Design a protein with these regions (language model features):
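Conserved pre-ATP/AMP-binding loop-to-beta segment of ANL
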Residues: 86-102
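Active-site glycine/GP-rich loop and adjacent strand/helix microenvironment
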Residues: 1-58, 66-73, 80-81, 88, ...
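Conserved adenylation A10 loop of the ANL superfamily
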Residues: 101-115
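Conserved AMP-binding loop of ANL adenylate-forming enzymes
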Residues: 135-179
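Short coil/turn segments at secondary-structure boundaries
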Residues: 55-59, 144-147
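Conserved structural elements of the adenylate-forming
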Residues: 117-138
């Protein structure tokens, strides 16, 4: 019997995955202590910023102190500070200047500029990597590392505003794909830079059709368009086009409305990993194949607060730390981050 030789990547994937699994377990087993440490580091790092001075961070010693001094804000309420950062002012929401702005739409005053700092950027990349490595640690599957991986994302071409690069979060993250994945990554840089989405999807279809695709990742609506174009061109199910496609990674929206459609498009079972990325931070990922739900990332430069959803608009609604939440209750999530968002309501 002829045994298939394993690649170096495949051989190294399992021990690396086990190492990351241990690291994640260390902080996830101690959620309260982990969040307390993050809270203290955030407050300590921002005491000399304009926001920190305005809210007397130097006298904040406990979470109760923070609740008294820092009200919950959405983007519109925080915009007076963000505008100063956008104009190039330093030490406003976080020390120094951000290295990027993630530009998103959807506010009454136009585009939102979400700061990304040198402290927060690594967590956007690390979280996605760790989600895949925990999958390896749990399942033992590593074959996919030998194939091609596609990450459907926005253009990596960035604009500049007062010396700070800005673009879509997915386009910013494209600049941080690890070197060991560069040869496996698709589409090509040139195709990824195509601005027109219709033309981009068509180019991606042409590039990927002859390849050994093993991981496909993206926002479900984008991936659906890609799958439908592949099917239109070949008349085949995705699982038949890409025989070794066995891992689908998705996030950004609720997947349930897409599930039946995707099962039909793919035509066979594939493993999947759900992610919860946002411009404001990478909040969670699915860490177990046999369980629904995601692991909240408590050690990623983000301090979480929660308000019961049905009480959120009440005058006396109570803000809760991770120690006070209950399973099965719907909450509005409030975040403070090492990118300079403070008691920020992301709207989820």
């Amino acid at each position: 019997m002829k045994l298939k030789a394993k690649s170096l990547k495949e051989l190294l994937a399992k021990p690396f995955a086990k190492q990351i699994q241990k690291r994640v377990k260390k902080w996830s087993d101690r959620p309260f202590e982990t969040q307390k440490k993050v809270f203290q580091e955030l407050i300590g790092s921002a005491t000399t910023t304009a926001f920190g001075k305005d809210h007397d961070f130097v006298s904040i010693n406990t979470y109760k102190d923070f609740v008294k001094r820092v009200p919950i804000r959405d983007y519109e309420a925080l915009k007076v500070y963000v505008d100063r950062v956008v104009k190039g002012e330093e030490n406003v929401l976080w020390k120094g200047k951000p290295i990027y702005f993630a530009k998103t739409s959807g506010t009454t005053s136009g585009a939102k500029y979400i700061p990304i700092t040198k402290e927060s950027m690594p967590y956007h990349v690390e979280a996605a990597r760790n989600a895949i490595l925990l999958y390896v640690a749990e399942t033992g599957k590593t074959d996919f590392v030998n194939g091609k991986m596609i990450f459907l994302q926005g253009s990596p071409i960035l604009e500049e505003k007062n010396g700070i690069n800005l673009g879509r979060l997915s386009g910013i993250v494209a600049h941080y794909i690890p070197k060991y994945l560069q040869k496996n990554r698709m589409p090509s840089w040139e195709t990824n830079c195509i601005e027109d989405w219709e033309a981009k999807v068509n180019a991606i279809v042409e590039e990927t059709l002859p390849e050994n695709m093993t991981i496909i990742s993206g926002i479900p609506s984008w991936v659906q368009m890609y799958f439908e174009r592949l099917q239109e061109k070949t008349g085949k199910k995705i699982g038949d086009i890409f025989k070794n496609f066995n891992l689908f990674i998705f996030g950004g929206v609720n997947y349930e409305p897409y599930r039946t459609k995707f099962e039909n498009l793919i035509g066979r079972k594939v493993d999947s990993i759900e992610l919860y990325p946002a411009s404001e931070g990478f909040f969670a990922f699915q860490d177990k194949q046999d369980e629904k739900g995601m692991l909240l990332l408590l050690n990623s430069g983000i301090f979480y607060e929660f308000v019961k959803a049905h009480e959120f608009y009440d005058e006396n609604s109570k803000r809760l730390s991770i120690e006070e939440v209950e399973i099965g209750v719907n909450y509005v999530m409030i975040i403070s981050t090492n990118a300079g968002l403070w008691a920020y309501n992301i709207g989820d």
